[in-house]
Amino acid sequence: MATSVPHPKIVKKYTKKFKRHHSDRYHRVAENWRKQKGIDSCVRRRFRGTIPQPNIGYGSNKKTKFLNPAGYKVYLVKNVKDLDVLLLHTKSYAAEIASSVSSRKRVEIVAKAKKLGVKVTNPKGKLNLEA
């Protein structure tokens, strides 16, 4: 099994979700983030004590942006043929088996990935041990 490409330390700067202003106060206001646009809005004017707003400073390092904790980019695999794409990229990409794949096909995908030297992020998911 190939190890991942060397990279800087992965830092997720803000792991909480940005909540919409007054979503905690009114049930009709969903938590999904919306930018405040009112002329008198204290959130838009960035007053002290208001909720944090998403901005470019919260962004991740470009080199580590889409990496999982093991240091791989994830590629969604739905059948055995999809693994052939990863043959030349075993150090930078890891296969993740889609949730819609049956347990019988999962076994085949994991076996082929092992043969090709491709890392699978969820090899034990949905496996039927009785079959």
Swiss-Prot record:
Entry-linked SMART domains: Ribosomal_L32e (SM01393)
Keyword Iron-sulfur carried by entry: no
Annotated compartments: Cytoplasm
MF terms (GO), sorted A to Z: structural constituent of ribosome
One cellular-component annotation, GO: cytosolic large ribosomal subunit
Annotated keywords: Cytoplasm, Ribonucleoprotein, Ribosomal protein
Biological-process GO terms, alphabetical: translation
Family matches, as InterPro entries: Ribosomal_eL32 (IPR001515), Ribosomal_eL32_CS (IPR018263), Ribosomal_eL32_sf (IPR036351)
Function: Component of the ribosome, a large ribonucleoprotein complex responsible for the synthesis of proteins in the cell. The small ribosomal subunit (SSU) binds messenger RNAs (mRNAs) and translates the encoded message by selecting cognate aminoacyl-transfer RNA (tRNA) molecules. The large subunit (LSU) contains the ribosomal catalytic site termed the peptidyl transferase center (PTC), which catalyzes the formation of peptide bonds, thereby polymerizing the amino acids delivered by tRNAs into a polypeptide chain.
Name of protein: Large ribosomal subunit protein eL32
Organism the protein comes from: Candida albicans (strain SC5314 / ATCC MYA-2876)
